[in-house]
Amino acid sequence: MERWLQEVPLPTAIFAAAYEMALVTLKALQRQGIAVPEQVSLVSFDDPTSAAFLDPPLTTVRQPLEALGQRAVQKLYDALQKGVMPEGTELLPPELIVRDSTAPPRAEGTKPSPIAKGGASP
């Protein structure tokens, strides 16, 4: 992650597909002296309780796990008891939990990383 941050233009935001990846990304950004969210916003998929206690608290996309479990059990019950096989796809909307790791994008969104070789300073 740190090497990637040095080699690419600094993005305005990073979306981590897993919470663990968000933790690695946050630590790499902090080690490189890149301020979250002032320079880069960070968002993660999944919303464990600990996300609210990071520095800064992490913006996340929460899956409706309880509702997903209820629907799965209902579909399994219907299949076993009623002989009704589920058809199609059912989508349950996620919820955006906005915390302090996100901000509006900075004006110079394409500015090179301040730590990249030959890059401009912030």
Task: Enumerate the predicted regions with their spans.
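Flexible loop/turn connectors
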Residues: 2-111, 117
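Short, intrinsically disordered C-terminal tails of secreted or membrane-associated proteins
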Residues: 120-121
